[in-house]
Swiss-Prot record:
It comes from Formosa agariphila (strain DSM 15362 / KCTC 12365 / LMG 23005 / KMM 3901 / M-2Alg 35-1). Pfam families: Fn3-like, Glyco_hydro_3, Glyco_hydro_3_C. A lipid is attached at residue 19 (N-palmitoyl cysteine). This is Putative beta-xylosidase. The lineage of its organism: Bacteria, Pseudomonadati, Bacteroidota, Flavobacteriia, Flavobacteriales. Residues 1-18 form the signal peptide.
Length: 756
């Protein structure tokens, strides 16, 4: 066997030198003056079948892409073997290194890859982004659900612009983000990775995230930004029971009207370079084996030209988990025929393709189709012409002062004021006050961050008290109630003028439930541990209690809502989160965030989102107050805003015309503040049962005390279309109600008639 292997290598070497001579004569695909398609056409026919299949696989750097003590590249035998034929990409190389070291490391890695495959094909280095580049030394922003609360798409664009720049500077080329999923079930552990429950809000945020990370597409070839991979197509956030990998049962109409639009906009408007398929199925059809979805909808209907990548091991799972393939080989064929171009991580899926082609030569046409998409991406990114990073640029560009300032700005626009009894907030920083910072979400630097904001008149004591879980990564367990910790915090509160409690959840109470030996979803949505008990005991002291919520999933905070004098919902902010929270608490900035989700009173209300069909709202439940605890779009301010004078440009609209609806907003308070003006539309009578209302526009404005501003929204026929009885998009005549206001339940309204 060893002798045969040696013979094969020798013969391969012979082919190598032969092809090198041909390449020296032509150098066609290296010619930067050719179009990208011409370069792909020149390169693809030169490649062997095995080399093509290598361009359809991504492996993780943790299988043996390392640095020695001196920083030099160290590759395992397994990795060396994989790279002989080239590779589509590598996930997270150098992720634990500082940016400069990572850039040097990735330059060395790319050089090795280029010099050790026949055609000098560079690799895609792939990262992710949930709160900045998923790597050491990067600027840490709030998570997507946090930034969605800003209702400021331009801010999201700027955040992701930094992500794109910082990622490219460390040698990355693609980002398996953003999530274009809707998240409507707070049991789901990955809730904070997406932009909320609403189709329109998510679409605006996704388009701006992609435009930002890709540098408005121009940054790809310029070498300043990276390609986006919108995920998870489609319906992933709708898993039954909020359980990762669970089945997805969703009507075709809901899929088309609510789930698809963020992905469609990612393709058509933002020109995302990549799409990642969903872990799950849609009504029994596995997404990774669904040509109607990945080819019919994505490519034939929307015109997507980029590549589709599997989620981790999901082609193989068609065989061993979903049981829709008879063998690993059949799973590979299903993925290929469906339109999966790159196999992520799996060792036993597309590796079968060369042998399968011997039995079914027609498969090579599909392989060529996928490889063409991968090569095109590499040419778009300029990797054949400029594959390396300028180290001097890294030193200047990562964690720039402007990026750190942006992280703080995004925090301030995203914090939501849920309650402010008797206007206890903002606190007077010039009044002598002793404040206790208490609770399981207090961090080591919380006290120091508050001290940087407060004046010398304010003194702080801080105590975490107890942890929520044992903080084990796979399946964390809740800790037993700690009476001593609770008593200590109550005594500290007793000896203070007021308490700020840091409650909610952390990364161990809401996270991705990886496939093996890991949990992250929940069956309940109340705050875990003794948090409710803590606030009740401190409230009983008769002193003011302010709650700062930190969390990654929506929580049913009934007790907290009842007991607290004020609540600031901060979700999961940037690395400067506690400093930003202090700035809000002491009135440097008025809070302007709005809820990107509906907050239920109980898990029994789920599914529960503001845009559900109107018939869902006709009845409540026994023994529980009806409606949400806090509605979508809700958020208070330190000021007050008066809405008046709602007007429309016309009472009638046709399929060929538009109308404009406006409202005047006045800041009637005494502080400068921002307000999110929201427009909802309701189809009063439809051929199918329609949503109660749908967000169709919003604008964030800033007003000085006493200042007024007129805000206008354009309503187009396209905004009113939906999937009708025949499963085709329709525009129906009739009455439409327009609601403009401060939340999904507080608004002024008018109406118009659509006439055919």
């Amino acid at each position: 066997m060893k002798k045969l292997l040696f013979t094969f290598l020798v013969s391969t070497g012979t082919i190598f030198f032969s092809c090198q001579r041909t390449y020296t004569q032509s150098k066609d695909y290296k010619n930067a003056s050719l179009t990208i398609e011409e370069r792909v056409d020149a390169l693809l026919p030169k490649m062997s079948l095995e080399e093509k299949v290598a361009q359809m696989r991504i492996f993780h750097a943790n299988i043996g892409v390392e640095a020695e003590g001196n920083g030099n590249l160290k590759l395992s035998d397994k990795v060396i073997e994989k790279l002989k034929l080239g590779i589509a990409g590598i996930k997270n190389p150098g992720e634990h290194m500082d940016p400069v070291a990572a850039a040097k490391f990735n330059n060395d890695l790319q050089k090795y890859i280029i010099e050790n495959n026949r055609w000098g094909i560079p690799a895609l280095f792939v990262t992710e982004s949930y709160n900045g580049v998923d790597a050491a030394g990067s600027t840490r922003f709030g998570r997507p659900l946090t930034s969605a609360a800003s209702f400021n798409p331009q801010l999201v664009n700027r955040i992701w612009d930094v992500v794109g720049r910082e990622a490219r500077l460390r040698g990355m080329h693609m980002c398996h983000s953003p999530e274009a999923d809707l998240v409507r079930d707070p049991r789901f552990g990955r809730m904070s990775e997406a932009f909320g429950e609403d189709t329109y809000l998510t679409t605006q945020m996704v388009v701006n995230a992609i435009n930002g990370v890709q540098g408005n597409y121009d940054g790809l070839g310029n070498g300043t930004h990276i390609g986006a991979v919108a995920k998870h197509f489609a319906g992933y956030g709708q898993v039954l029971g909020g359980s990762n990998f669970a089945a997805i049962e969703i009507s075709p109409r809901t899929l088309i009207d609510e789930i698809y639009p963020p992905f469609e906009a990612a393709v058509k408007e933002a020109k995302t370079l990549g799409i990642m398929a969903s872990h799950g199925d849609i009504n029994g059809v596995a997404s990774h084996g669904n040509p109607e979805l990945l080819t019919g909808v994505l490519r034939d209907q929307w015109g997507f030209k980029g590549y589709v990548v599997s989620d981790s091991n999901d082609i193989a799972r068609l065989f061993y988990f979903m049981n829709v393939a008879e063998s690993p080989e059949e799973a590979a064929q299903m993925g290929l025929e469906a339109g999966i171009d790159i196999d992520l991580y799996a060792e036993d899926s597309y590796a079968y393709l060369p042998e399968m082609v011997k039995k079914n030569p027609n498969l090579e046409k599909l392989i060529d189709r996928s490889v063409r998409r991968v090569l095109r991406t590499k040419f778009i990114l300029g990797l054949f012409d400029n594959p390396y990073i300028d180290i001097e640029e890294v030193k200047k560009g990562v964690r720039a002062n402007s990026s750190l300032t942006l992280a703080k700005e995004s925090d301030l626009e995203s914090i939501i004021l849920l309650k402010n009894e008797n206007k206890i907030l903002p606190l007077n920083k010039n009044k002598t006050t002793k404040i206790a910072l208490l609770g399981p979400l207090v961090k080591d630097d919380t006290k120091s961050m508050f001290e940087t904001v407060a004046s010398k008149h304010i003194s702080f004591v801080a105590e975490k008290g107890f942890h929520l879980t044992d903080e084990k990564g796979g399946a964390p367990k809740l800790l037993e109630r700690d009476e001593n910790a609770i008593s200590k915090m109550v005594n500290m509160a007793k000896n203070s003028d007021l308490s700020i409690l840091f409650l909610g959840g952390d990364e161990f109470t809401s996270k991705e439930a990886f496939f093996n030996n890991a949990l992250g979803d929940r069956a309940t949505i109340e705050p875990v541990g003794a948090q409710d008990e803590l606030i009740e005991k401190i409230k009983a002291l008769g002193k003011p209690v302010i709650v700062v919520l930190k969390h990654r999933r929506t929580l049913a905070i009934n007790t907290i809502s009842e007991q607290a004098d004020a609540i600031l919902d901060t979700w999961d902010l940037s690395e400067f989160g506690d400093e930003s929270t202090a700035r809000i608490i002491f009135g440097e900035v008025s809070p302007s965030g709005k809820l990107p989700v509906t907050v239920p009173r109980s898990i029994g209300q789920i599914p529960f989102h503001y845009s559900m069909k109107e018939i869902n709202y006709k009845k409540g439940y026994l023994f529980m107050e009806d409606g949400p605890l806090y509605p979508f779009g809700y958020g208070l301010s330190y000021s007050n805003f008066e809405y008046s004078d709602i007007k429309k440009s016309n009472s009638e609209m046709t399929k060929d015309s538009e109308i404009e609806v406006s409202v005047t907003i006045k800041n009637t308070g005494n502080v400068k503040a921002k307000e999110v003006v929201q427009m909802y539309i309701k189809d009063v009578k439809g051929s199918v049962i329609r949503p109660d209302k749908e967000l169709k526009g919003f604008e964030k404005i800033s007003l000085n005390p006493g200042e007024s501003k007129k805000v206008s929204f354009k309503i187009t026929p396209e905004m009113l279309k939906f999937t009708g009885l025949k499963m085709e998009k329709v525009l129906e005549s009739g009455e439409y109600t327009v609601m403009i206001g401060t939340s999904s339940v507080d608004y002024k309204k008018t109406s118009f008639q659509l006439k055919k």
